[in-house]
């Protein structure tokens, strides 16, 4: 009985330690995924959202971005480099044009080409209903670049990948 008791206790201690490490010290991969989850949460909008919630979410969106973020898109008038403040303003303007809005990210493929840099290829889906009653349902493939700054992963580039159609 005593011979079995100590190995069981040792296994339990190791298991608890591994679980604690997984929850208290997430991998870089999980930290990057968390940034996309936060962006999705804060861009999304429910009908009847309060002004306080709108202001909080818009401010929070800005905190996810680096001081400058590049956007590359087939619509050349949208392409360019934007400051964090400009992104916050665009987010405010965009969210007020919708009664409901949902942003989801799928199929995240994350690579770390160098320390402090993450490349992510993913599918983004934006759905919603505008204040004019029009429905939006857009799906795009994106390539994103995140850079680590002061232990936080910040978005520094988004590129919309053009998909060839028949």
Question: Where are the model-predicted features located?
Answer:
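Transmembrane signal-anchor/signal-peptide helices with a preference for the extracytoplasmic
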Residues: 18-34
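Short beta-strand edge/turn micro-motifs at domain boundaries
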Residues: 117-121, 133-166
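Hydrophobic membrane-insertion alpha-helices, especially the h-region
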Residues: 6-22
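Surface-exposed, charged secondary-structure patches
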Residues: 26, 86-132
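Sec/Tat-exported extracytoplasmic proteins
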Residues: 40-47, 65-69, 91-98
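Short extracytoplasmic/periplasmic juxtamembrane "stem" segments immediately C-terminal to an N-terminal membrane anchor
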Residues: 34-49, 86
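Stable alpha-helical elements in mature extracytoplasmic
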Residues: 28, 35, 57, 83, ...
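Short, solvent-exposed secondary-structure junction/capping segments
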Residues: 40, 58-77
């Amino acid at each position: 009985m005593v011979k079995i008791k100590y190995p069981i206790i040792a296994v339990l201690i190791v298991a608890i330690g591994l679980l604690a490490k997984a929850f208290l010290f997430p991998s870089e991969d999980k930290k990057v995924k968390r940034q996309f989850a936060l962006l999705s949460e804060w861009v999304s909008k429910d009908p009847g959202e309060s002004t306080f919630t709108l202001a909080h979410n818009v401010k929070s969106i800005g905190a996810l971005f680096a001081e400058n973020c590049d956007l590359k898109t087939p619509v050349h008038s949208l392409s360019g480099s934007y400051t964090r403040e400009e992104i916050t303003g665009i987010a405010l303007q965009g969210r007020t044009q919708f009664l409901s809005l949902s942003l989801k990210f799928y199929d995240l493929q994350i690579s770390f080409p160098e320390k402090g840099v993450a490349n992510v290829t993913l599918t983004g889906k934006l759905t919603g209903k505008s204040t004019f009653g029009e429905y939006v349902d857009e799906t795009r493939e994106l390539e994103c670049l995140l850079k680590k700054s002061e232990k936080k992963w910040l978005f520094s580039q988004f590129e919309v990948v053009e998909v060839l159609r028949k």
